[in-house]
Design a protein with these regions (language model features):
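Short, charged surface segments at domain edges that flank catalytic/cofactor-binding sites
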Residues: 1-26, 47-51, 55, 77-80
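Cys/His-rich zinc-coordinating "finger/knuckle" motifs
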Residues: 33, 37, 68-71
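Short recognition patches in nucleic-acid-associated and regulatory proteins
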Residues: 34-47
């Protein structure tokens, strides 16, 4: 498992089976099963050392990743959706 995927799964308590690779992670955009953990600020495009922080990691389907990933016109929308997702989870996690 890649480092950024583990960071995301740990933060959001995603159930993961290391033997089968199965998980219950859902896309933050559609709620469909996620295949990719997307870097909102790409590692090679200014993300640098902060690229693998939870604020920069977002679960997406493969199709969503291809459509929205690494495209400047969608970055603000992805950040908005992701920040709302973090807030919702944090409220439930720390009640």
């Amino acid at each position: 498992m890649q480092k950024h995927t583990k960071i995301y799964f740990d933060f959001f308590d995603v159930e993961y089976d290391p033997f089968t690779g199965q998980h219950n992670c859902k896309s933050e955009l559609s709620g469909l099963p996620a295949q990719d953990i997307h870097h909102i600020e790409a590692r090679g495009m200014g993300g640098g050392k902060t690229a693998d922080r939870i604020e920069n990691l977002m679960a997406l389907t493969r199709e969503e990743h291809e459509k929205y990933g690494d495209k400047k016109q969608y970055k603000a929308m992805l950040k908005r959706v992701h920040n709302r997702h973090i807030e919702r989870i944090a409220k439930n996690k720390f009640k």
